[in-house]
Amino acid sequence: MKKTRSTTLRRAWPSSDFSDRASDRMRSRSEKDYRLHKRFPAAFAPQASRGYMTSGDVSPISMSPISQSQFIPLGEILCLAISAMNSARKPVTQEALMEHLTTCFPGVPTPSQEILRHTLNTLVRERKIYPTPDGYFIVTPQTYFITPSLIRTNSKWYHLDERVPDRSQCTSPQPGTITPSASGCVRERTLPRKHCDSCHCCREDVHSMHASTLQRKSAKDCKDPYCPPPLCQVPPTEKSKSTINFSYKTETLSKPKDGEKQSKKFGLKLFRLSFKKDKTKQLANFSAQFPPEEWPLRDEDTPTTIPREVEMEIIRRINPDLTVENVMRHTALMKKLEEEKAHRSKAGSSAHHSGRSKKSRTHRKSHGKSRSHSKTRVSKGDPSDGSHLDIPGEREYEFCDPLTRAPREGCFIIEHKGDNFIMHSNTNVIESHFPMTPEWDVSGELAKRRTEMPFPEPSRGSSHSKVHRSHSHTQDRRSRNERSNKAKERSRSMDNSKGPLGASSLGTPEDLAEGCSQDDQTPSQSYIDDSTLRPAQTIGHQRAHIPSASYKEVCIPEIVGGSKEPSSACSLLEPGKTPESMPSYGELSPCPAKTAVDDYFQCNTSSETVLTAPSPLGKNKEDHDTLTLVEGVKKLSPSERQTPHSSREPVGHKEESPKGPGGGPAASGGVAEGLANGRLVQHHSAEPSSLDKRKEIFSKDTLFKPLHSTLSVNSYHKSSLSLLKSHPKSPVDTLPGRCEKLEPSLGTSAAQAMPPSQRQQEPGGNQEASFDYYNVSDDDDSEEGANKNAEEEKNRDDVGTMQWLLEREKERDLQRKFEKNLTLLTPKETDSSSNQRATHSARLDSMDSSSITVDSGFNSPRTRESLASNTSSIVESNRRQNPALSPAHGGAGPTFNFRASTDPPTSEAEKLQKPSNCLQASVTSV
């Protein structure tokens, strides 16, 4: 009965005592063992055990008060007493509680201080009361968590409770001492354990008084049979150390220790099993209590880690469209689009890639970032970003082509195929890399665009074309918002109509084959197809010949550095003079084209782009240097930028005069140079400014391309064909060949000014320029050889570029018409700078539409103006992308002449005017 009662009444005073005691016993045992081993001889435990066994068995059972005590829940009584004392604002200490119990319950035996302390600790543990230096207080919702924190502070709940109660109990008697003692207890488990033991002993004394209490105590103290003796011995130390309460405990324990131990022992034995069970239950309850106590804390912690399901539900409720599925779908779509684009580029670039991978990979290794940026650019729509993430294989493959590969190497290596090609490519790639690193955002934007408009995806090249045009008409904006403009460019590159149409027009298989056969540079141009497809290469060479002499000086070193054909570059320059019609082209391109570009993109890069135009000339080392210098000039000052620009521009004028038969080619070369410059500058500038330049080049390409197309009207028709084919095949290696070819072809073009043969010969430069425009699609860029170009065409078809091919056919026809008009306009443009500027404004307007139009998906109706814009943009992009392409164009004498034409008067102002002319030509062609 008593056992049952005690178990049942645990929550009553005895039961709570017992529960606490049971826990205490368990604790006491571990603590006691620790304490015994630490401070007490083993003998104490045995003695205690013996004492418990002998005297403890009978006394607790025989105690009469037990029945009453069991029925009197000490814990509840204490709670009532504490509540009453709190209401009376009396400090609740153990002594005060004893007095209160004695006063309020005169007939009930007063519990010993040890029992009282133990019960108070139990209540604290149960969070019914909480101790403070001022005494105990009833726990309220506001103070409910004070106890847990107190308990948590202590190493053990029991000890904490004990210590805390000690504080409270001693607070009124000895608040200062007690508080430190409590702290000490918390610090020293040994003392608290001793306290527990003492408490148990005290409880045992009380148990002697109250059988039930004693039994309960014994049950709990059974854990610590030895504990009481050690407690007695240790208590003095504990008293001083832990608290006065401890001292009380010690005193109590020492007095009734023997009897209590015996009674405890008996009670523990009697109730040991039941208490163990109860203890286990209590421990479970105790643990169960802990979670409730901690639940709020857990809840507080949980919000920081909301379950995935809940989080997703919240997201769904906030934005139903924003789901993991949708996000994954979006990501998958973007990946698919990029993969399609990459496949497209790879389809035509697989061969290119093998060839290009040999050199380009070396370059990539040296300029992995450049390549990455190239990819970014491709994604962005910049051919120089052929290695763009979107189309990593695209540009790379373009470079890979034996011919295209040289340009790629040009982008990556200075030594491959003449430093001007390689250096330019290197610079291009580096430039792409450094600027492109920022442009990765653009690639992301392109991915977004693709996600938004997946169908434009087919027009990778067209996206480049659109990007170029976007750059052209947004050149000023680019100065302000290069990043945003790049995003726009990419979005434009998303337009299928622009890239595909341009690519189709320029990249007809005929054009590809023609370009390939015509000039190795064409592949570079093809590679550069992004914005500076081929005009960029021609311009690259011209760029190398900032002046004729300058180009020779620079271009020769560059070519020598490239070891492709220094003489080729020089020859190109000089053959450029031979086809000074090409110089006319150069004039038109450098002065008008660049002017158009600069005028068109009057942003900081207008002169820089012009300056850059010569740099593509030197895709060779000189191109790289020029490009770098051009970039530096771009960065340093418009004057410096204009200086190469001016040099080129005079050549442009010189060449423009001879442009008679070769005027178209010269213009094409000039455009190519401008494009090459713009593109090369972008590639060369491995700096943020390079990015700007590239962006500027894109815009300028838009300007340059139409001009280039116009200039290379004759060569552009064939150029578009041969360019398309030669573009992919023109690499850095091809560029020297192109230079050689272009030199004779430029000579021929000089003789023929605009004859198809010149166009064919000049495709590296002029045709490439025209091809560049059409070769906006990365596929063309990917194709590195003439075969690569043809493959590129096929690849585009494979990539679903049939529309592009058709568009390219249309674009080619338009481009031819435009080039014819442009050729006709070429003389005009030099003459009518103001008209050209007006045209430039018109073209800027038309460029906006054309950038829309050029993308084969969105504005299939292409105005010649848009074609010109795209061509310039593509040529520029190609030139930027493929330094070799620029040299390929540069390979054409006109291109170099363009650069060589260093008309001081044709500097910034003339450049601006000539861009106006270029714009006018573009508008007129439209």
Curated annotation (Swiss-Prot):
| GO biological process per UniProt | embryo development ending in birth or egg hatching; maternal placenta development; regulation of transcription by RNA polymerase II; response to bacterium
The name this protein goes by in its record: Storkhead-box protein 2
List every stretch annotated Disordered.
1-32, 338-393, 452-529, 564-586, 633-693, 723-802, 823-926
Which regions are flagged for Basic residues bias? Answer: 353-378, 463-472
Organism in which the protein naturally occurs: Mus musculus (Mouse)
Q: Which domain of life is it from?
A: Eukaryota
List S-S links within the chain.
Answer: none
Bias type Basic and acidic residues, positions: 18-32, 379-393, 473-495, 633-658, 684-693, 785-799
Q: Where is the composition biased (Polar residues)?
A: 518-529, 746-769, 847-884, 914-926
